[in-house]
Amino acid sequence: MFMHSLGISVYPDKSDIKEVYEYMETAAKLGFSRIFTCFLSIPDDKRESYLKEFKGFMDKAHELGFVVAADTNPEVFKLIGATPDNLKPFADLGLDIIRLDGNFGTQGDISVTRNPYGIKIEFNASMDAGVDLLIKNGGNKDQIIMCHNFF
């Protein structure tokens, strides 16, 4: 079975948030249901305000019916206090899908797929992510998504 959905890329920290919300509203009216965004550039000196703004963005996305995937990496995990065994900081933000730009090794990648929050973990299908090995060794296949690069 294949899952198809239309999506948009949105970068709320790089654009006027009012324009971003208008774009999201238009896309929702046209039947788009997925947003891809980047969650890689969290300024350390403005972390709290950035996370508050991102949470507002997530709330608006969900209000409009979007599922949101955010590109992130192990460095961001550390910055917001998340670990492969603890995705609560991402759950608190309302993230639906974490697209891993990098990995935590086999055991860490297995752990991240077994999170209790229902957050899907998206691996890059353009690279050999070794997903078959993850599943064979206990990764939760119901929380694994594969997606090719958007460019």
Predicted feature residues:
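Alpha-helix-loop-beta-strand connector modules within alpha/beta enzyme cores
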Residues: 47-73, 109-126
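Active-site beta-loop-alpha junctions enriched in small/polar residues
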Residues: 9-13, 40-42, 71-77, 101-105, ...
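Active-site mouth loops of central-metabolism enzymes
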Residues: 2-22, 69-82, 122-124
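Glycine-rich, proline-tolerant flexible connector loops at the mouths of alpha/beta enzymes
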Residues: 29, 33-56
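Short, well-ordered coil/turn segments that N-cap beta-strands
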Residues: 2-6, 31-33, 60-68, 94-96, ...
